[in-house]
Amino acid sequence: MRRAGCATVEAVHTDPTSLTFRSAEEADWPAMALITATGFGVWRSEETVAVWRSMMPADSAVVACDGDDVVGTALFLDLELTVPGGAVLPMAGVSMVAVAPTHRRRGALSGMFDELHRRMNAYPIAGLEASEAEIYGRFGYGAATVWERLEVHRRGARFHLAVPDPGGVRIVRPAEHRAQLEDIDERWRRRTPGGLHTPARLWDEILADREGSRNGGTPHYCLLHPDGFAFYRLHGSDEKTTVEVTKLAAATAEAEIALWRVLLGLDLKEIVGVHTHPGNVLRYLLTDPRLVRTTNVEDGLWLRMLDIPAVLQARTYSADLSVVLEISDEFLGRGGRFALQVRDGHAHCAPTTADADVHTDVSVLGSLYLGAHRASSFATAHRLRCNDSQVLAALDAAFAVDVPAELGYGF
């Protein structure tokens, strides 16, 4: 793996609750699997676990123990996150976080997170998906992407006359076109804030298409365009009338339109569903946008800045900006006062003693980073304080993005 090094830490930490926190050992993995299956209600196969373990740096898993018993688990993966403008940051992807129901509210999660974040010194940023939205803000994580669940009643769907029909889509067996799928996915993620590099072992797992990953659906079908692809499954009773798009990656607008034309042209199917970013183009393609229904909206990727200046300097910006940020960070103490200067899309950020224009915490900064949320919204909610409306408008303009943020894949 590209980043195998982590900070050296003590082997065991003990807290007042009598739980101990230490590095996970090989013998702990069966117990870790039991704890996570109990927490999430899903058993992962040994083959699937091996794939995710191949993405872990050394010493990146910790366990909480009550005596000899493992009662909690947490780890992080070595991921590559695309940020606005196309730069890529190494990201510690926190995963497999679970505590036994017998040991709730005894400090297991806090103890594991203390231990886990000590090991992230090689990373400027960390990310996770939150099973419960109220948990992770206190650790400095903020929701940075949004999933919108769309359903289309396809029988009445008609495309506007102005919408082109690019063509070029084929129905293929995905394993026979792996190289092309990998290339398209890499092009897509390089332009998409929130995109993640998919390593070879994870592609092996995707194409293995194990029954445990199907959520009751059929094996994957694949639509392939020179600049995009869509994976989908069929769900329902014997007739399988619901199409569930599990991944749509388009490197061009033409490819996205071409794929939607085929998906909405699947005869004998009633509903096409997809999880996508807010503002998806689909409604604008159809003569009757009411056929596209939003059935759910929820957070996707949560981000936590570990090196604030480095992370803010990594992305590009949509407008010039000169602002002093006062960032609080109660969990790790990595906040402070920072001068952020943006000229021609590029930023310089450094600690300063100047008076602050904006006061907020590191979780809000994480939510703003990929452009999915506006500073003015947090100001309205009193989670960001700024007494100058022009500065607030400048923040909104600078952090805005042309390409909507979208999490590359779940981890």
Whereabouts are the PLM-identified features?
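Active-site rim helix/loop that mediates acceptor-substrate recognition in acyltransferases
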Residues: 39-83, 194-221, 311
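Intrinsically disordered, low-complexity, positively biased terminal segments
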Residues: 1-17, 84, 162-411
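Conserved GNAT acetyl-CoA-binding A-motif
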Residues: 113, 117-130, 267-278
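Conserved beta-strand in the GNAT
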Residues: 63, 69-78, 93, 98, ...
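Conserved active-site alpha-helix within GNAT-family acetyltransferase domains
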Residues: 121-150, 279-295
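Conserved acetyl-CoA-binding loop-helix of GNAT-fold acetyltransferases
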Residues: 94-118, 253-264
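Helix-loop element at the rim of GNAT/NAT acetyltransferase active sites that forms part
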Residues: 27, 34-47, 186-198, 267
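Conserved acetyl-CoA binding element of GNAT-fold acetyltransferases
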Residues: 89-101, 240-251
